[in-house]
């Protein structure tokens, strides 16, 4: 393996790890193995700390391919709690409001999910890395400032209801770059005339890369020590 010339690695991001931590951890062990102090390493799409799943990491000259990977279709499995919202639309924040769910049936959920297939306009979460006048939205939101983000045009290719244990549902989503599943959960809750937030998220596929092809970052040190790695002079 030649990490300087460029390699593409697939990781299964663990729960609680930031995407930045996965990259830093991988870089540290590559540099250790190559006996170098620095190496260009980047990832092709952030996953929130509370999400797990496929993360593509590029090294050396392969970092030029990051944009190519970012445009690949992504597949997620999301667990959504109906009847309650949080400021971040996930478990990062406490519940801030509750809503009725008695009127929600499996049939209503399935009918509502169909309305999200195709091109949709989605307002990103205030707690996101989107920029507002040069500042990150989450920095402004954490300071208690009102954050107004413009809707983005996205494509949802598929939504499938996997489990329906009301007021909790589990869905599979195939979508385009830039889709916030947290925001999708929010919008599904509103469309059901209730509220909703994300309680679990797994990115199961990016392009053709599936979860079962991915390395566990916690075992990366052991894995890289068994590889034939090109050592820099």
Curated annotation (Swiss-Prot):
It catalyses: uridine(55) in tRNA = pseudouridine(55) in tRNA. Keywords: Isomerase, tRNA processing. InterPro entries: PsdUridine_synth_cat_dom_sf, PsdUridine_synth_N, tRNA_psdUridine_synth_TruB, TruB_C. SUPFAM superfamilies: Pseudouridine synthase. Its EC number is 5.4.99.25. The keyword Plastid does not apply. Gene3D superfamilies: Pseudouridine synthase. GO terms for biological process: mRNA pseudouridine synthesis; tRNA pseudouridine synthesis. The active site is at residue 48. One of its GO terms (molecular function) is RNA binding. Transmembrane segments: none annotated. Belongs to the pseudouridine synthase TruB family. Type 1 subfamily. NCBIfam families: TruB. Responsible for synthesis of pseudouridine from uracil-55 in the psi GC loop of transfer RNAs. This is tRNA pseudouridine synthase B.
């Amino acid at each position: 393996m030649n990490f300087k010339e460029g390699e593409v690695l697939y990781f299964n991001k663990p729960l609680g790890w930031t995407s930045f931590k996965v990259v830093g951890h991988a870089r540290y062990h590559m540099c250790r193995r190559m006996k170098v102090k620095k190496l260009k390493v980047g990832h092709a799409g952030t996953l929130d700390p509370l999400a797990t799943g496929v993360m593509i990491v590029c090294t050396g000259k392969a970092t030029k391919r990051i944009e190519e990977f970012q445009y690949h279709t992504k597949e997620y499995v999301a667990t959504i709690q109906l009847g309650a919202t949080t400021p971040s639309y996930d478990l990062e924040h406490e519940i801030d409001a509750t809503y009725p769910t008695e009127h929600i049936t499996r049939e209503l959920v399935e009918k509502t999910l169909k309305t999200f297939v195709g091109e949709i306009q989605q307002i990103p979460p205030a707690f996101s890395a989107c920029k507002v006048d040069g500042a990150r939205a989450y920095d402004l939101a954490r300071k208690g400032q009102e954050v107004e983000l413009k809707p983005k045009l996205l494509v949802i290719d598929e939504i499938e209801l996997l489990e329906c244990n009301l007021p909790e549902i589990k869905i599979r989503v195939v979508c385009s770059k830039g889709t916030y599943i947290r925001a999708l959960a929010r919008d599904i809750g509103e469309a059901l005339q209730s509220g909703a937030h994300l309680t679990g998220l797994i990115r199961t596929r990016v392009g053709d890369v599936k979860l079962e092809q991915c390395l566990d970052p916690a075992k990366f040190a052991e894995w890289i020590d068994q590889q034939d790695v090109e050592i820099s002079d």
